[in-house]
Amino acid sequence: MNSASDTHFSLFGLPEHFEVDDGALNAAYRTVQSRAHPDRHAHASDAERRVAMQWATRANEAYQTLRDPLKRATYLLHLRGVDVQAENNTAMPPAFLMQQLEWRESLADAKAAGDLDALDDLLAMLRGEKRARYQTLAGLLNGGGHDAAAADAVRQLMFIEKIERDTAEAIDRLDD
């Protein structure tokens, strides 16, 4: 198995890019897990079982990070020494803040009216916005030299994903 200093990407033999081949990631994860799975080391020494458990845990964490685009982008920036500062840097461009307010108002109005069509429309629009922003983020991350802009894009995507979840939950509640 690889050394503890390897990246999540190298653990699975993948290039350090924002775009990840899901099939290759899944196959590599299964391979690493099969080698590190604690059941495979049931008759090993305590130390060997502990190491196997650590590798299985590391593989799970790496897999969860790489399969989620937002976590993957944050991780790539971390590898480059850039802290996204999601907790303490909530500064956003005024246009994005206005858009966010409009989305929140649309969500509140649709929920209050019980308007499933409006919620569906908002969810579709948010998903389209998210797709477009992920494409932009990929260009920033893969183009090099745009790490600060990529960190800003990650923070904006966090807001978009939050309102997307809130909208999907509102739809689920109305469907019940």
UniProtKB/Swiss-Prot annotation:
GO biological-process terms attached to the record: [2Fe-2S] cluster assembly; protein complex oligomerization; protein folding
Matches recorded under SUPFAM superfamilies: Chaperone J-domain, HSC20 (HSCB), C-terminal oligomerisation domain
GO cellular component, as recorded: iron-sulfur cluster transfer complex
Xref: SMART domains: DnaJ
Top-rank lineage group of the source organism: Bacteria
Cited InterPro entries: DnaJ_domain (IPR001623), HscB (IPR004640), HscB_C_sf (IPR036386), HscB_oligo_C (IPR009073), J_dom_sf (IPR036869)
GO molecular function: ATPase activator activity; protein-folding chaperone binding
Keywords: Chaperone
Residue span(s) of domain J: 7-79
Cited Pfam families: DnaJ, HSCB_C
Similarity comment text for this entry: Belongs to the HscB family.
Role: Co-chaperone involved in the maturation of iron-sulfur cluster-containing proteins. Seems to help targeting proteins to be folded toward HscA.
Subunit structure: Interacts with HscA and stimulates its ATPase activity.
Official protein name in the record: Co-chaperone protein HscB homolog
Species name: Ralstonia nicotianae (strain ATCC BAA-1114 / GMI1000) (Ralstonia solanacearum)
Underlying gene: hscB
